[in-house]
Amino acid sequence: MNIIDLRSDTFTQPTDAMREAMAGAEVGDDVFEEDPSVKKLEQLAANKMGKEAALFVPSGTMGNLVSVLTQCNRGDEVLLGDQSHIFLNEVGGIAALGGIHPRTLPNQKDGTLDLDALDKAVRSKNLHCPPTRLICLENTHNYCQGTPLTPAYMENVAKLAARHSLKIHLDGARIFNAAIALKTDGRELAQE
């Protein structure tokens, strides 16, 4: 009997064909950027997302951590949803490893953050508070029933971020799910 476990996409298992492909893959030294499989995967990801380059990391948690640490300094603040994966399921990595202050706002049922609340939450000039540097979003939003963030919403957040000279990080672990649900592609959902 085949059992389908729908608790999380993390329960997926590779097929026999996938295992064979991994076992037969050409490998090289990753330190010297000589692993052709990784280079090909990174180029494929960059092309699918319309980006100049991509970086392979072994987990979504590491991808989020690298991205947030790249865009913030110790003592900076990140605004993110109270139901976001980064806040709930990534062992406080941005605070523990980066000294970055996570400040949560309530996620709406559709995974969005209220734009007025987000606008009011931005801090930059008060020397008693950590300066806000980054807004983190998640698409699709895992704890909000897998709802996708629309390009229109993302554009509104981008305009808000630009007004405050903030950066945006998109946790896109399920971005292709969002693209399918919205009948678009990853490029549109990851525009700068």
PLM segments and residue spans:
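Conserved PLP-enzyme active-site core in the AAT-like
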Residues: M1-E192
